[in-house]
């Protein structure tokens, strides 16, 4: 399906501020919510529409509305929730899935500790959100789980991606399109994206 880099000037400006090491936790969290609105706009750009009959104060008309079942936003905990908040402001009727994964710092492999999703995700568009696509291990594991539950129409949304992560992800799930604000240089020896912005979860919650 490929990779879409969202190059909108507002996205890039806000991302630069988020990258700065002196940006405060409060500012980082606010910027993440703001940028999630802009990214959500892009990832939902080609949703299908139908029409319904309504009445304006002046006359009846056929007006466009979203077709099909409501979206599912699937957040990879915990950092994914930073993107989720803004996206729910934009699409408040969306269903939500939570996927609890943490990365073993020695093996860099994901360990699942929580999974909760709507039962009827088979015919829904599922947008998986996680700020970072680094090794891609967590993203691949999350989408493996969603596909086990029957999801077939999936997109992945992140702030930053590493070339190594994109390569692994697209090999594992070639049917899932990736949306990101930036493809950075590479991964370092600890599996962090560089130049990156640090650990998104730690910067969002003020933890180490």
UniProtKB/Swiss-Prot annotation:
This is Uracil phosphoribosyltransferase. One of its GO terms (biological process) is uracil salvage. NCBIfam families: PRK00129.1 (NF001097), upp (TIGR01091). One of its GO terms (molecular function) is uracil phosphoribosyltransferase activity. Pathway: Pyrimidine metabolism; UMP biosynthesis via salvage pathway; UMP from uracil: step 1/1. Binds 1 Mg(2+) ion per subunit. The magnesium is bound as Mg-PRPP. It comes from Brucella melitensis biotype 2 (strain ATCC 23457). Keywords: Allosteric enzyme, Glycosyltransferase, GTP-binding, Magnesium, Nucleotide-binding, Transferase. Uracil binds at residues 193, 198-200.
């Amino acid at each position: 399906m490929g990779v879409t880099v969202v190059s909108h000037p507002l996205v890039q400006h806000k991302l630069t501020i988020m990258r700065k090491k002196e940006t405060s936790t409060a500012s980082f969290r606010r910027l993440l919510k703001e940028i999630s609105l802009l990214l959500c706009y892009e990832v939902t750009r080609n949703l299908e529409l139908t029409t319904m009959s309504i009445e304006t104060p002046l006359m009846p008309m056929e007006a466009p509305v979203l077709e099909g079942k409501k979206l599912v936003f699937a957040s990879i905990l915990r950092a994914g929730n930073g993107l989720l908040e803004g996206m729910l402001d934009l699409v408040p009727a969306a269903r939500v899935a939570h996927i609890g994964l943490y990365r073993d710092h020695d093996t860099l492999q994901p360990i699942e500790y929580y999974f909760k999703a709507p039962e009827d995700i088979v015919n829904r568009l599922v947008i998986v959100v996680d700020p970072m696509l680094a090794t891609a291990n967590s993203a691949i594991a999350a989408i493996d789980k969603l596909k086990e539950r029957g999801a077939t129409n999936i997109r992945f949304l992140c702030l930053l991606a590493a070339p190594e992560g994109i390569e692994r992800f697209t090999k594992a799930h070639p049917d899932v399109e990736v949306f990101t604000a930036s493809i950075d240089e590479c991964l370092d020896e600890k599996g962090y994206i560089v130049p990156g912005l640090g650990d998104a979860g730690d910067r969002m919650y003020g933890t180490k």
